[in-house]
Amino acid sequence: MAGLQQGCHFEGQNWTAPHWKTCLPCQGPWRLTVSHLKTVSSISVLSVVFWSVLLWADSLSLLAWARETFTLGVLGPWDCDPIFAQALPSIATQLAVDQVNQDASLLPGSQLDFKVLPTGCDTPHALATFVAHKNIVAAFVGPVNPGFCSAAALLAQGWGKSLFSWACEAPEGGGDLVPTLPSAADVLLSVMRHFGWARWAIVSSHQDIWVTTAQQLATAFRTHGLPIGLVTSLGPGEKGATEVCKQLHSVHGLKIVVLCMHSALLGGLEQTTLLHCAWEEGLTDGRLVFLPYDTLLFALPYGNRSYLVLDDHGPLQEAYDAVLTVSLESSPESHAFTATEMSGGATANLEPEQVSPLFGTIYDAVILLAHALNRSETHGAGLSGAHLGDHVRALDVAGFSQRIRTDGKGRRLAQYVILDTDGEGSQLVPTHILDTSTWQVQPLGKPIHFPGGSPPAHDASCWFDPNTLCIRGVQPLGSLLTLTIACVLALVGGFLAYFIRLGLQQLRLLRGPHRILLTSQELTFLQRTPSRRRPHVDSGSESRSVVDGGSPRSVTQGSARSLPAFLEHTNVALYQGEWVWLKKFEAGVAPDLRPSSLSFLRKLREMRHENVTAFLGLFVGPGVSAMVLEHCARGSLEDLLQNENLRLDWTFKASLLLDLIRGLRYLHHRRFPHGRLKSRNCVVDTRFVLKITDHGYAEFLESHCSSRPQPAPEELLWTAPELLRGPGKATFKGDVFSLAIILQEVLTRDPPYCSWGLSAEEIIRKVASPPPLCRPLVSPDQGPLECIQLMQLCWEEAPDDRPSLDQIYTQFKSINQGKKTSVVDSMLRMLEKYSESLEDLVQERTEELELERRKTERLLSQMLPPSVAHALKMGTTVEPEYFDQVTIYFSDIVGFTTISALSEPIEVVGFLNDLYTLFDAVLDSHDVYKVETIGDAYMVASGLPRRNGNRHAAEIANLALDILSYAGNFRMRHAPDVPIRVRAGLHSGPCVAGVVGLTMPRYCLFGDTVNTASRMESTGLPYRIHVSQSTVQALLSLDEGYKIDVRGQTELKGKGLEETYWLTGKVGFCRPLPTPLSIKPGDPWQDRINQEIRTGFAKARQGLAEPRKSGEAGPGP
């Protein structure tokens, strides 16, 4: 039989790879003639030849069996990408493996084998395939996907295997990751440095392998300091290409577009679509150069090779004129194999098929791996795949398209060629060559044909100089002198303009009707606080008397004093016959009247509104600086609300609130947020008109860089949560939140957040750090529902959800149906209401208080023992109490977990409420105390808090029998066919009882008796009352006829083996008890009960069970 034959044909640069065929020689039938029978002697000769052939074949098989095999794996997306599959990895690897195995100088005594490992096109699946074959192969060729190069390198290092990949970057100096080609990023940088193009864009296909390639390429470019204008990927179809073209249009100064996708020359549809779109959008007119990335990974055929996609004289042929193709150089004489060499000199019947040029890249990687393995074995490392990168230095062997050469550091050296078209033909023409040993680009004599006749403009050379700082393509050192001169001239001109403007502004500040600076000659300071009536005095004469230092002249409400001494104790003065208020700055702070501060003061001066206090000027006196504001004699809104002698009805409140909203609306229309709005800086004048004050104070301090005093926690109760968390700058939405807090104050006449009962620090912390949201509580009877809803809308957590002041103003006016409120009429109505009988009101409040007191005491006595409740009411300490003899009852529901899982939460709550209401009714007929219920657990004690001698065991035993009897007939409403199996545990002994906690205090029991009773319940069985020996002794001492059966030794957690008993009845107890299950040791009774519960629920869900009321008797268990 003929052996397997191989072959490969090369036709110039248009090379093809073979199909494999098994060629069997034609064997005709044996034809025996008389001549054969007569030649007897020939039989012996044939026999000798036959046995000799057999012995020779056997020796060859033994020799092959004795050779050690090194298996390598070829990773790649061979199964999911048709263009990658055209590389024929099986044939390429087989050719290389056969060449190695046939070379006697390579791997003597060993042989090379391979496995092709399809990885899929996505990174997770590729990494999983890589990990799955760690024990099958000794080294890897790949990966092709750079997305998992780093992970694969780390894993391979741990496994002691090497990776030979043309897609992965690796540090110099060998190791387990060996690049089989020079860095693609370095090749592109060398080409672009030669042409002087620095501004890049990278467009990739949507496939994972190409997206990752684009990202790593962009990272490499940014590492070299190059500007990357765009990194994007193509969406599906022509729409995605159109979107990318629009993005390329928008990038300023772009020169190069790297295309990370399959080349259009090899059938890449994405690149074909993108180039067609670029041609339609006019991007192929010479302004851009498109550069395919995938051709850097193989030797693309050129010369006499024609490409059909460029032979149609269509848009793609014209668009490809703007494409420069960089590919490995390919020389016909450099091919490692010819058809004769690969077939071993034998004739082969092969059918040619066009394949991807990546075929040769795979072949070279296997050859490089084989030579590294040969050197490793020569140096005594054995046939191991570890650290093969240390053995590829200074290598020079025959490759597929050119010789495989490496330098002294193991870096691959190769030659690249730049290919171009003229926009009319279908062939690629070499124009430049790049040798990676020198990284120099040399022209080959034929110039590049650029669309439009000229290449894109050069970028600044500083982009490619690692020792030069390049800012937007300009070398700063070249224009430093010009910039310095321009800056000096600009500074001189600016200083001159500044001083001239400052002088003019100083004149305006002190003269004219719009002056801002006020002096001591214009203010009169009084000894006493002014009355609500406006005094009429001659401000000019009064000012002169103060300045002259003589005896003060008599005025209406007081006398003037010497200015320096009196200013420390007053904030009120007279200015042009009107009372004014001085908002003083901190001691030692002298406002710096710089232009920004003066502009701010003029803005304040121009604000005039009846609901905003007027800013009259800035007073600077000896040791005192203050803002002069309009004075309102009735004080702040906070003072007004705290005045209990003043009754405020809704009309009065609405009038104040409407004034507040109008004033704040005016500030917001002037683009002036308040930032510190609170009821303390809302003042009321003599006509009960509310005005907003204190606006601009903090901003003025900030405008001339003066320190802003740190507010106390009580001052921050009106501040919005986003301002508490952030820098605290004034915002319009922050004022809306403050308005909502003032609304709460006015409606309730209480301080902010008073209903929480917390300190200011705690409230601020809760407001600033939700959830939960912390907001004031306002009952519906404290104001109109519409006003409360508006208030709640204003304090929304998200600032964008709060309404604007225009919306608030419109909504608030609608609350009063647009009517104007009169404060005088409101005060008259309040006086009429105040004349009503207070005695009836006091009597009504007294009766309500007594009723609430009785309710509270009754509720407290249900939650705690009466003695404990009384002590808590009196405020005395509840001391823990020791009880020497008590009996504790624990019970739970068997299968409760399964019941809960099969029921809705509301059904579980209803079922437990029905069951425990039934149990609570049983408690009334026994001397017991219910301690607590937690989930399905029910805890009762007797002998505490009221001692009952030796009756505690009997009371609990009687209770347990009653509960067991009632539980046997109990049925759930939503699953009436499911029986409720209760198990109980009893134990007697001493314990300690006391109250734990101040918030929601609980009466708790402590001691080993509690734990033992719980263990008795947890080790019991359904429809059983598990009793400890101490309880049995107490019951037998009473001699009341309790029926007790011995259970035997029971393992109790923390106790070991103890003798326990079943309480099965009592003489004279006539109620029926449910029949316990027949349970043997080791019997999985829990599974049986859970299955029964599931069956019952299934019936209930299907409507097979008859509906019953909860607690109604049903069929016995």
UniProtKB/Swiss-Prot annotation:
Segment forming the signal sequence: 1-66
Disruption of the gene: reported phenotype: Deficient mice lack olfactory response to uroguanylin and guanylin.
EC top class named in words: lyase
Stored PROSITE patterns: GUANYLATE_CYCLASE_1, GUANYLATE_CYCLASE_2, PROTEIN_KINASE_DOM
Keywords: Cell membrane, Cell projection, cGMP biosynthesis, Disulfide bond, Lyase, Membrane, Nucleotide-binding, Signal, Transmembrane, Transmembrane helix
Bilayer-crossing regions: 480-500
EC number: 4.6.1.2
Catalytic reaction equation(s): GTP = 3',5'-cyclic GMP + diphosphate
Protein's name according to its UniProt entry: Guanylate cyclase D
Regulation of its function: Activated by Ca(2+).
Regions of this protein lying in the Extracellular compartment: 67-479
Region (Interaction with NCALD): 874-915
Gene Ontology BP annotations: cGMP biosynthetic process; detection of carbon dioxide; detection of chemical stimulus involved in sensory perception of smell; intracellular signal transduction; olfactory behavior; olfactory learning; positive regulation of cGMP-mediated signaling; receptor guanylyl cyclase signaling pathway
Subunit-level organization: Interacts (via the catalytic domain) with NCALD.
Location of the Protein kinase domain: 541-812
Pfam families named among the record's database cross-references: ANF_receptor, Guanylate_cyc, PK_Tyr_Ser-Thr
UniProt KW Lyase keyword: yes
UniProt note on tissues of expression: Found in a subset of olfactory neurons in the main olfactory epithelium.
Similarity field: Belongs to the adenylyl cyclase class-4/guanylyl cyclase family.
Record's comment describing the protein's domains: The protein kinase domain is predicted to be catalytically inactive.
SMART domains linked: CYCc
Topology class, membrane: Single-pass type I membrane protein
Compartment(s) where it occurs, according to its Swiss-Prot or TrEMBL record: Cell projection, Cilium membrane
